[in-house]
């Protein structure tokens, strides 16, 4: 499969990049590891993280101003790509990159459908399922998977305040501290930490560390129509 431009990641940025390239006459494909478009925007995280309205411009601003719900955003993004003549390949993720003279020539893709809860599998259903050849590759994934596979240098974690003379860089003190016991058996460090917790110490204020932002899950609530009751679990202890 040969294209002028391959955009890896069908989130909002990937959709806009693909449409911009298509407007210039390029033959474009979007490769999206999940089964939907829009990334976090298509998943329901819209205006709550928009910030200052004047910071958003170009083709993106009129879309965000519509204030769609997540399903509508996914539909809008799909219609945009279809109208632009962009091919979309869902449920495939990068597994290998071929570079020649420092340029990406092809990418190998695994077929790895997400499960019913929207979680990516540890192992693909079919390895090396597709090969994409393109003149230009754009990595719009949140994690930078294509970039990493291509051997591009990158950094993660927090840089020290002194690295770029940024007053608020580096580790920062916690905004809040909650009295929640972190151990499997309350008060017993020997019982181990609860799932998802780690014992890595936070660096001194202003210093660098290799910690990244924790994942958060947000639920979309509706008050009529498709709403379902929220029942407390059997072992819920308020």
Where are the language model's segments positioned?
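Flavin (FAD/FMN)-binding glycine-rich loop and adjacent Rossmann-like elements that form
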Residues: 103-106, 111-136, 140-238
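Alpha-helix N-cap/helix-initiation motif
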Residues: 10-11, 66, 127-130
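Solvent-exposed loop/turn segments at secondary-structure junctions
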Residues: 11-13, 35-37, 47-48, 95-96, ...
């Amino acid at each position: 499969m040969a294209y002028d431009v391959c955009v890896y990641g069908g989130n909002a940025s990937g959709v806009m990049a693909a449409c911009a390239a298509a407007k210039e006459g390029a033959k474009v494909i979007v490769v999206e590891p999940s089964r939907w478009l829009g990334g976090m925007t298509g998943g329901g995280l819209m205006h709550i993280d928009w910030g200052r309205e004047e910071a958003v411009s170009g083709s993106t601003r009129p879309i965000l101003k519509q204030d769609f719900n997540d399903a509508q955003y996914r539909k809008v993004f799909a219609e945009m790509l279809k109208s632009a003549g962009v091919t979309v390949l869902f449920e495939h993720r990068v597994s290998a990159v071929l570079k020649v003279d420092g340029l990406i020539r092809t990418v190998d893709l695994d077929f790895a459908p997400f499960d019913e809860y929207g979680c990516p599998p540890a192992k693909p259903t079919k390895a090396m399922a597709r090969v994409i050849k393109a003149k230009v590759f754009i990595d719009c994934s949140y994690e930078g998977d294509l970039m990493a596979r291509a051997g591009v240098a990158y950094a993660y974690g927090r840089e020290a305040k002194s690295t770029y003379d940024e007053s608020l860089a580096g580790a920062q003190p916690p905004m809040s501290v909650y009295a929640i016991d972190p151990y499997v058996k309350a008060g017993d460090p020997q019982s181990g930490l609860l799932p998802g917790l780690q014992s890595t110490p936070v660096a001194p204020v202003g210093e660098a560390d290799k910690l990244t932002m924790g994942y958060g899950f947000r639920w979309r609530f509706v008050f009529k129509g498709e709403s379902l009751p929220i029942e407390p679990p059997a072992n819920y202890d308020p």
